[in-house]
Amino acid sequence: MNAIVGIQATVDANNHITRLGVTCALCHSTVDNSVMPGIGRRRDGWPNRDLNAGAIIALSPVLSAEKKAVYNSWGPGKYDPRFNLDGKNTPLVIPPAYGLAEIKNETYTAEGPISYWNAYVAVTQMGGQGNFSDPRLGIEIQHSPDMVTPKLAALRAYQHSLPAPPPPASSFDAAAAERGSTLFDQACSTCHVAATGTDNNSGKLHAAADTGVDGAYAARTANKAYRTTPLRALWQHPPYFHDGSAATLADVVAQYNRVRAIGLTAEQQRDLVEYLKSL
């Protein structure tokens, strides 16, 4: 694995990993390619959409052929944080970890604040030696000493310090974006509220049918519904929706226009896309 992703693992006589140097940055950091493709200044918080975590996991010699097929099906930029617990396969697009300072609940399904998800991933996915408990999911993991919980506050503070990146110069049509801003206020701001871009800060969740997205992943979670996703730096991280089912922002706008019967013309949809690119 060191040759593939730059992390090292130690295994025992049964080929079980006993130590692995995996961190949040594996999935939530990339580089600006300023030296050459794949080499440059680090960009923490940016989703690593080149990472094929499933293919890496599938290299394990102790996995069954059936499980290897599941892991290999995910593709680059996706990960299923529940497959090892419930055996169901609905991988998610790796989300950004920037712009979270004003966001109440992390994750697509808003099961808890950022430290909740950090603990979940550290303990249930990364093999961290710590505690995680969620009776809603039937998870109760205790480890002594707890080496995860004491680190959560500092990790949260660092993540809260990561701003959403502004759009590159000349990456959108400013006049169209201005028209799109008016359309956004009329058609989208009920759910994408104020500066945070989400109504979940007030506790709101949405059934999959409300947005036309697949509900299989939400059904596996504690809330059984989706959070309105914040919109800052949308330009940076296609594809969209939790499962990557929308390749472009134009696809996103077209889907909501259809599902919510908003009635935008083709020109209005283009203007709205330019506004979203400006965020």
Segments from the language model and where they lie:
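Electron-transfer interface patches adjacent to heme c in soluble/periplasmic c-type cytochromes
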Residues: 1-156, 160-177, 182-279
